[in-house]
Amino acid sequence: MSTHLRKLPGLLLCLLLALPAWYLGRLFPIIGAPVFAILLGMLLALFYEHRDKTKEGISFTSKYILQTAVVLLGFGLNLTQVMAVGMQSLPIIISTIATALLVAYGSQKWLRIDVNTATLVGVGSSICGGSAIAATAPVIKAKDDEVAKAISVIFLFNMLAALLFPSLGQLLGLSNEGFAIFAGTAVNDTSSVTATATAWDALHHSNTLDGATIVKLTRTLAILPITLGLSLYRAKKEHDIVTEEGFSLRKSFPRFILFFLLASLITTLMISLGVSADVFHSLKTLSKFFIVMAMAAIGLNTNLVKLIKTGGQAILLGAICWVAITLVSLAMQLSLGIW
């Protein structure tokens, strides 16, 4: 059997799990399809006995389909629009990202969490949830159970944010503009930002959704420097790319991140030339579906019992990051006169 044919059973299995997960994600956007995919994968893994037939395809999906999803994610970024609208929120975005990464780094040894899980929780909390985890996991060579743990933590606090933040914003007296920035900087995943802003709009008959989404997309750009920094750090630590001249940036930089940037530049250029943004909608949708497929593969490679036993510390780290980001986002708004 050829290499491609050996991958087919595992690919089909991930596809079959992704389809109901995608449907459930549409029904319950506050949870999201990636979480359903991981759950379905982990549940099936408890009973699944034909791993030899599907192993190669599952591994291919969790690595290469995931990287392809990140590349396609770039087609959802019009850099001109993001920079024009997101510049006001840039100081807040930088502050919240720096806070989450520093908190994750500082708490990792104290909580006795493995470095990869702490890194994934940090980038997932600070940048863009599942998409940031998807982009970072291959760079740091995270294991599937570490990815599943981080995604589960991010999901938990996404759900809490969507439920609590509209009432918190009202209690604090945030303006519509202030809440859009708050939701865009303090909520992790795009679907949860959408749910949070929509709940606020329903309460106040306003339109914060567009502003919150663009702030969120501006955060997504942080994937580039963060993944580059992590890849260089890992290369230096492992001494696997050292030459007489020093580091080779070409070898250190993950190629799929370069293609992500290229996709963003193509989108920006085409839209500036008058091409409708709707042209790229199908690629954005395909990116999301590929992430769901990859999460199904990660679920299939994850031990659910072990995840439950070892997940408490990761949840605590996620809570610390979440509270820190929330406080910094509000404090920065106050200092900048937005709130």
Curated annotation (Swiss-Prot):
Annotated membrane-spanning segments are 7-24, 28-50, 57-79, 84-106, 118-140, 150-172, 256-275, 290-307, 314-336
Name the membrane topology term.
Multi-pass membrane protein
Q: Where found, per UniProt?
A: Cell membrane
Broad class of the protein's primary localization = membrane
Q: Which InterPro entries match?
A: UPF0324_pro (IPR018383)
Question: Which Gene Ontology cellular component terms are annotated?
Answer: plasma membrane
**What are the alphabetically sorted keywords of the record?**
Cell membrane, Membrane, Transmembrane, Transmembrane helix
Does Glycoprotein count among this protein's keywords?
Answer: no
Pfam families found in the cross-reference section? Cons_hypoth698
The cross-references to PANTHER family, in alphabetical order and at most eight, read: INNER MEMBRANE PROTEIN YEIH-RELATED, UPF0324 MEMBRANE PROTEIN FN0533
Q: Which family does it belong to?
A: Belongs to the UPF0324 family.
Protein name as it appears in the record: UPF0324 membrane protein M6_Spy0799
Protein's organism: Streptococcus pyogenes serotype M6 (strain ATCC BAA-946 / MGAS10394)
